[in-house]
């Protein structure tokens, strides 16, 4: 316990690389000097090298990841796979080699009756040892042994590999400035000069300044490869100013393959990514080392977050909030990087962003529920049964983009909290409270975990205004109250909003009950003409308040979401279809996302297949452009002329389905 703070640093400790590399060099030199190739512990590819590989990862990451602080080599190799620091096949190769080397070691010691790891040189002893280990002869034993040692040697060569080729200065400072002269204007040169002459840089320790000078030529080399080098460099300078105060980040850039190139590419592609990293430089490590070849599944995200939450104590609310925030931010950044580099399909990106939110929500509810139950116990259900931790009488419902599985990079979460507890009965813990108080505190605690603003930002903005009675209503509603409100008091626009809802997490019974209520409300018999008129009137109000101004429209500006022919028109048509047609076609309530809703309407014969396909294509194109603009930090406006065909397709269907009197679009 006394040595732990010295062995395991609190954050990822890249500064130990130089020491580890030196230690590795000492091991290699000792092998050559002492000619210990026949020593299966100290020789090349031996037991010591496997242990060194494990200890390298423990020293670098063990301060932040408690599960890596074990002493069993084989268990730690498995943990390195769980922590995604080693690939499964790498760990398996090392484990197999370790077990075989230990078998050989035990055979040597049993035959010699002494503590030695030296292979026998006498042919008689060699033959005997081969027989003991189950081999036909010494040659067969050595073939297997050398294969295992070669595997170990390869992994040993890769760990903290000599980066002199990476860390060498590509050019001296004058040569770098010459390269920059060709791409920087006068203002750019002044900003670079101001950076290098800043008081902040002057105050840096000499070691940190030298690291910055090592990073700089590689950074410029990468910057010169992108389309807009000056803009990219101006985005990177604020990040360098932030991270040079903790030179461990500079070491990380020097130590990670391709880290500088990825950082430059992402900064060139998205000012949003650059600004996120400037605001939260702690994300840099995860961002530059995360896998972006494939988008993660929800199961992978959940397992990752579970592992991270195991690093903090159950009572450490601040630590839990920090992990939720940084997990969300780092995973969203990874999706953005994957999106930009691999041009992911829109729906795959939205799925990934939605899964991140779901995993964070599920964890927040789990943490909040466990904390409350430990203090107050569990409430009773409305039917008198006792709720359980695995099946609480509480659920979180997602509305809007979360409900529709259509989250973007900056989306907030529209949430409604529902319960099925006996509001008057007390919980069964040492400090009992009423069921209603329990649910209110649970919802508030979930909100706290998600929305508390700290130096690391917040996990999500949360909007609960869509709950029954809006701001005037209770933060948590019972299933009974929710049903009564939807049946007797809700406006049509609230039923529209119900189209894009789904249960996110909580007790299975409550989630199933919500699904049933949603289905029954959406399939109520309605006058299609009245629905059409209310949808038209609501959409007109939105356009007047949120759409482009008259002058902007005359200037040929098209707002992708709010103007005629935009995303909201398509969403309103889908919602109209559910409200007007699901009474006769109850399967239209199966899904909450627009793409599958339109497909179901075509299947039911409510829309022609060609109309549904046209709306789907327009919807995906327009939403994909909003994602691109969000990453570029640009407004959601485009040239009306360039989007003329798409707008006309949507507007023609709007006229046919909702508003025959709608004015034609300006060509």
Over which residues does each language-model region extend?
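A nucleotide- and high-energy phosphate-metabolite-utilizing enzyme signature
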Residues: 1-667
């Amino acid at each position: 316990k006394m040595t732990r703070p010295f062995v395991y640093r609190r954050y990822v400790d890249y500064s130990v690389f130089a020491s580890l590399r030196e230690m590795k060099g000492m091991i290699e030199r000792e092998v050559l000097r002492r000619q210990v190739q026949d020593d299966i512990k100290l020789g090349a590819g031996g037991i010591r090298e496997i242990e060194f590989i494990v200890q390298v990862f423990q020293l670098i990451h063990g301060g932040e990841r408690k599960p890596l602080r074990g002493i069993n080599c084989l268990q730690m190799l498995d943990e390195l796979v769980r922590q995604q620091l080693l690939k499964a096949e790498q760990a398996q190769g090392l484990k197999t080699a370790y077990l075989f080397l230990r078998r050989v070691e035990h055979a040597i010691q049993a035959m010699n009756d002494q503590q030695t790891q030296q292979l026998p040189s006498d042919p008689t002893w060699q033959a005997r040892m081969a027989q003991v280990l189950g081999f036909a002869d010494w040659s067969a034993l050595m073939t297997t042994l050398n294969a295992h040692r070669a595997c170990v040697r390869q992994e040993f060569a890769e760990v903290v590999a000599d980066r002199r080729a990476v860390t060498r200065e590509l050019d001296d400072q004058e040569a770098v400035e010459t390269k920059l002269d060709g791409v920087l204007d006068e203002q750019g040169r002044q900003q670079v000069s101001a950076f290098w002459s800043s008081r902040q840089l002057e105050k840096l320790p000499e070691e940190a300044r030298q690291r910055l000078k090592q990073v700089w030529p590689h950074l410029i080399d990468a910057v010169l490869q992108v389309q807009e080098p000056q803009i990219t460099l101006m985005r990177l300078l604020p990040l360098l100013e932030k991270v040079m105060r903790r030179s461990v980040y500079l070491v990380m850039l020097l130590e990670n393959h391709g880290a500088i190139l990825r950082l430059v590419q992402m900064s060139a592609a998205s000012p949003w990514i650059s600004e996120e990293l400037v605001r939260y430089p702690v994300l840099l490590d995860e961002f530059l080392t995360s896998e972006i070849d494939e988008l993660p599944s929800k199961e992978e995200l959940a397992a990752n977050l579970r592992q991270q939450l195991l690093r903090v104590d159950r009572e450490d609310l601040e630590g839990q909030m920090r992990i939720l925030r940084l997990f969300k931010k780092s995973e969203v950044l990874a999706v953005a990087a994957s999106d930009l580099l691999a041009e992911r399909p829109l729906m795959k990106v939205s799925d990934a962003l939605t899964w991140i939110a779901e995993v964070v929500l599920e964890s927040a509810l789990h943490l909040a529920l466990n904390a409350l139950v430990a203090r107050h116990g569990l409430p009773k259900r409305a039917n008198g049964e006792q709720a359980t931790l695995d099946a609480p009488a509480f659920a979180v419902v997602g509305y809007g983009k979360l409900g529709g599985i259509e989250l973007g990079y900056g989306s907030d979460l529209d949430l409604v909290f529902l319960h099925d507890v006996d509001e008057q009965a007390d919980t069964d813990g040492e400090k009992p409270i009423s069921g209603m108080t329990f649910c209110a505190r649970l919802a508030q605690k979930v909100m706290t975990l998600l929305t508390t603003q700290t130096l690391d930002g917040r996990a999500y903005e949360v909007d609960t205004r869509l709950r029954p009675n809006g701001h005037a209503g209770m933060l948590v509603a019972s299933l009974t109250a929710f049903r009564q409100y939807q049946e007797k008091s809700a406006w049509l626009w609230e039923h529209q909003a119900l189209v894009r809802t789904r249960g996110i997490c909580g007790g299975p019974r409550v989630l199933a009950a919500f699904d049933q209520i949603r289905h029954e409300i959406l399939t109520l018999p309605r006058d299609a003409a009245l629905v059409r008129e209310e949808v038209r009137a609501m959409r007109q109000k939105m356009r007047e308040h949120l759409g482009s101004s008259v002058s902007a429209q005359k200037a040929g500006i098209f707002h992708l979401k709010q103007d005629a022919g935009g995303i909201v028109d398509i969403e309103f048509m889908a919602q109209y279809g559910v409200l007007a047609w699901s009474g006769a076609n109850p399967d239209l309530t199966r899904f909450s996302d627009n793409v599958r809703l339109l497909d179901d309407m075509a299947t039911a014969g409510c829309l022609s297949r060609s109309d549904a396909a046209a709306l789907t294509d327009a919807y995906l194109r327009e939403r994909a452009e909003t994602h691109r603009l969000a990453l570029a930090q640009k407004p959601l406006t485009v040239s009306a002329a360039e989007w003329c065909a798409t707008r006309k397709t949507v507007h023609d269907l709007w006229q046919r389905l909702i508003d025959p009197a709608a004015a034609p679009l300006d060509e």
